[in-house]
């Protein structure tokens, strides 16, 4: 498994591009802010997005979803509990095609991921476990736990 980290937007949100070395397709996790720039970098690596996976629905994690999905047609996954977040926190209505929840297993682009529902930062926050790597969104911050004081 190959993992590339892009720090995007003014909050320097961690966006991850993950792929199986044997596959041309990849997954994008939390494409905040700059969809065009993220997609340009993915293409520089010779990859094609097979799906967008969201750890939660806040604007700094979903900002690039619409443009990437519109250009590639790839599906977008989010936990259903985040569909009712305040639009002020989500940059408008969240674009998605599928919902997932606790215990769901995904097989995308030669990668197997397990969804772990971790509410607190948002009602629908999830962590995504792929092999021995956990993508935690804002459930964890560097050196501390994530914030739980935000509305929604």
Region spans (language model):
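Conserved beta-strand hairpin/beta-sheet module of binuclear metal-dependent hydrolase folds
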Residues: 1-45, 126-137, 142
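Short Gly/Pro-enriched turn/cap motifs at secondary-structure boundaries
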Residues: 6-8, 97, 117-119
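Active-site HxH/HxHxD metal-binding segment of metal-dependent hydrolases
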Residues: 23-26, 33-112
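Metallo-beta-lactamase
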Residues: 92, 112-117, 122-152
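Residue-level signal for pocket-adjacent positions within structured domains
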Residues: 1, 6, 81, 95, ...
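Short, basic and Ser/Thr-rich N-terminal targeting/leader segments
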Residues: 11-12, 109, 122
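Conserved S/T- and glycine-rich ATP-binding loop of Class I adenylate-forming
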Residues: 18, 55, 118
């Amino acid at each position: 498994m190959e993992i590339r980290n892009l720090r995007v937007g003014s909050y320097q949100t961690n966006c991850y591009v993950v792929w199986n070395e044997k596959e041309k397709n990849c997954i994008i996790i939390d494409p905040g802010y700059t969809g065009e720039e993220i997609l340009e970098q993915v293409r520089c690596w010779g990859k094609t997005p097979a799906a967008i996976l969201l750890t939660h629905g806040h604007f700094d994690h979903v900002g690039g979803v619409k443009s990437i999905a519109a250009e590639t047609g790839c599906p977008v996954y989010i936990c259903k509990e985040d569909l009712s977040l305040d639009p002020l926190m989500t940059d408008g209505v969240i674009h998605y095609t599928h919902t997932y929840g606790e215990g769901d297993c995904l097989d995308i682009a030669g990668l197997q991921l397990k969804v772990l529902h971790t509410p607190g930062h948002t009602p629908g926050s999830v962590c995504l476990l792929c092999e021995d790597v956990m993508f935690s969104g804002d459930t964890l911050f560097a050196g501390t736990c994530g914030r739980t004081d935000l509305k929604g």
